[in-house]
């Protein structure tokens, strides 16, 4: 590893051709479909002083800054051409305050590691649906994670954070101190104008029993399945996470639907009661029916690696739909007309018997229906084809779209709104105040 004039700064400089160490560090991301962008240098920070030095180096060189936590973002925003890339993989901190049930975690902390750490204390935090998602990008983008229908968005659990500004100053942010940055940290995503070095997060009591009901139908059952679920959500326990995937049935080469209903509780009896409305009333005609199966997050994360392996090529787009639309009619094509054998459509309903009111934070787009399309493939020659069919499908939904999830924003291919109008103005104002040169921000709102 090449070292700068400061012996304490672990830095890899771009060379021509790039060194193997540089290229391995540049491409430490989940998505095999990566932009041909080359950071000016990559800093493998393992302490705060490295991060501060990297920020000051960027200012000296008039370079932008990219920050990588887990590298799971499918948009690969951290591969920013000509930037100083600060990779936080080796910058690790994880501690717990027993008195206030609060965890302190570095942005590089992976979801699976946080769950394991908290389980020993009989506590829980709603991390992402993949175990190797780092907290940094996940929380800044809002945190649509485990049972968001019941737990809400993960960013709502942020009680404070330590940050480094674009000038290299270390500050704390919470409801009373630098409250504008605290507001922005909960949903501004890549437009957050500082670098998070520590999150302070409230935790929940761990519900120790986790069971799942799983059913697979042919896509011809789409109308019956989705109408049944829409009606069911009004009375279904908030401790039940509903997820429906549209996919191509293996060997049959026809579209299918799979429902995962995952429930959490204190006992098997308690969980069975929560799943009973699904077990007893699900529509007939299934290819596969599993009424009450034990599951856990490590198993789920391992199974997820089979469907979404690291290094495959990905493209995704995710939106919230307007209240009052005919959801079943609007999304039928998404789930029944998948164009590629590994493609996935996804519905995560947020509806409960009481409408949730979001706290005052940057994350301001919310509705009962969150839907997503995902392309998974291996051949680089398919890039444009895979991107186009998803963008075209999402454009066809635009009359029904309330807003786009900031983590899957495509401001060039499909411009959208990622916050409410008022929240977007605040994101811009806070960004200009704390990062007037757009050294850190500016990926989505490039003209702000």
Swiss-Prot record:
Q: Which UniProt keywords apply?
A: FAD, Flavoprotein, Oxidoreductase
- Annotated coiled-coil positions are none
Where's the FAD-binding PCMH-type domain?
35-206
Describe which pathway this protein belongs to, using the record's wording. Answer: Secondary metabolite biosynthesis
Matching entries from Pfam families are given as: FAD_binding_4
Q: Does the keyword GTP-binding apply?
A: no
Q: List the disulfide bonds.
A: none
Q: What is its EC number?
A: 1.1.1.-
Q: Which cofactor does it need?
A: FAD
Q: Which Gene3D superfamilies would you find in this protein's record?
A: 3.30.465.10, 3.40.462.20
Q: What class of enzyme is it?
A: oxidoreductase
Q: Is Flavoprotein one of the keywords?
A: yes
Annotated membrane-spanning segments are none
Q: Which GO terms describe its molecular function?
A: FAD binding; oxidoreductase activity
What the record says about family reads: Belongs to the oxygen-dependent FAD-linked oxidoreductase family.
Q: Which PANTHER family match?
A: BINDING OXIDOREDUCTASE, PUTATIVE (AFU_ORTHOLOGUE AFUA_1G17690)-RELATED, FAD-BINDING PCMH-TYPE DOMAIN-CONTAINING PROTEIN
Question: What does the UniProt function comment say about this protein?
Answer: FAD-linked oxidoreductase; part of the gene cluster that mediates the biosynthesis of the indole diterpenes nodulisporic acids (NA). Nodulisporic acid A (NAA) and its chemically modified derivatives are of particular significance because of their highly potent insecticidal activity against blood-feeding arthropods and lack of observable adverse effects on mammals, in particular the tremogenicity associated with the paspaline-derived IDTs is not observed.
**Name of the protein in question:** FAD-linked oxidoreductase nodO
Organism name: Hypoxylon pulicicidum
What is the phylogenetic placement of the source species in the record? Eukaryota, Fungi, Dikarya, Ascomycota, Pezizomycotina
């Amino acid at each position: 590893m090449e070292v700068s004039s400061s012996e304490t700064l672990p830095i890899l400089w771009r060379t021509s051709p790039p060194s193997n160490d540089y290229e391995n560090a540049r491409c430490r991301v989940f998505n095999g479909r990566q932009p041909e962008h080359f950071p000016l240098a990559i800093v493998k920070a393992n302490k705060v002083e490295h991060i501060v030095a990297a920020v000051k180096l960027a200012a000296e060189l008039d370079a932008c800054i990219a920050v990588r936590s887990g590298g799971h973002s499918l948009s690969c925003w951290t591969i920013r051409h000509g930037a100083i890339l600060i990779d936080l993989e080796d910058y690790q901190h994880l501690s717990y305050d027993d008195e206030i049930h609060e965890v302190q975690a570095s942005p590089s902390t992976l979801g699976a590691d946080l769950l394991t750490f908290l389980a020993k204390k009989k506590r829980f935090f709603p991390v992402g649906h993949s175990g190797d998602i780092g907290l940094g990008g996940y929380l800044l983008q809002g945190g649509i994670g485990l049972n968001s229908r019941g737990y809400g968005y993960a960013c709502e659990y942020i009680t404070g954070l330590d940050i480094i500004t674009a000038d290299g100053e270390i500050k704390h942010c919470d409801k009373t101190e630098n409250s504008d940055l605290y507001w922005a940290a909960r949903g501004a995503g890549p437009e957050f104008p500082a670098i998070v070095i520590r999150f302070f997060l409230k935790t929940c009591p761990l519900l120790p029993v986790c069971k799942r009901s799983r059913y697979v139908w042919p896509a011809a059952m789409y109308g019956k399945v989705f109408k049944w679920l829409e009606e069911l959500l009004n009375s279904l326990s908030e401790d039940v996470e509903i997820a429906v995937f549209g996919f191509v049935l293996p060997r049959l080469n026809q579209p299918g639907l799979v429902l995962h209903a995952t429930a959490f509780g204190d006992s098997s009896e308690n969980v069975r009661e929560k799943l009973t409305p699904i077990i007893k009333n699900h529509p007939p005609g299934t290819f596969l029916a599993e009424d009450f199966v034990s599951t856990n997050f490590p198993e789920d994360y391992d199974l997820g690696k089979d469907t979404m392996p690291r290094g495959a090529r990905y493209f995704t787009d995710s939106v919230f739909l307007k209240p009052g639309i005919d959801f079943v009619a609007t999304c039928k094509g998404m789930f029944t007309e998948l164009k590629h054998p590994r493609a996935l459509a996804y519905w995560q309903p947020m509806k409960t018997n009481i409408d949730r009111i979001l706290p005052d934070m940057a994350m301001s787009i919310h509705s009962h229906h969150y839907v997503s399309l995902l392309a998974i493939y291996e051949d680089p020659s398919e890039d444009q084809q895979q991107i186009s069919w998803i963008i075209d499908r999402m454009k066809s939904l635009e009359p029904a779209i309330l807003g786009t999830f900031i983590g899957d924003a495509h401001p060039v291919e499909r411009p959208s709104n990622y916050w409410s109008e008022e929240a977007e103005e605040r994101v811009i104002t806070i960004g200009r105040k704390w990062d007037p040169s757009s050294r850190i921000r500016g990926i989505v709102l490039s003209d702000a």
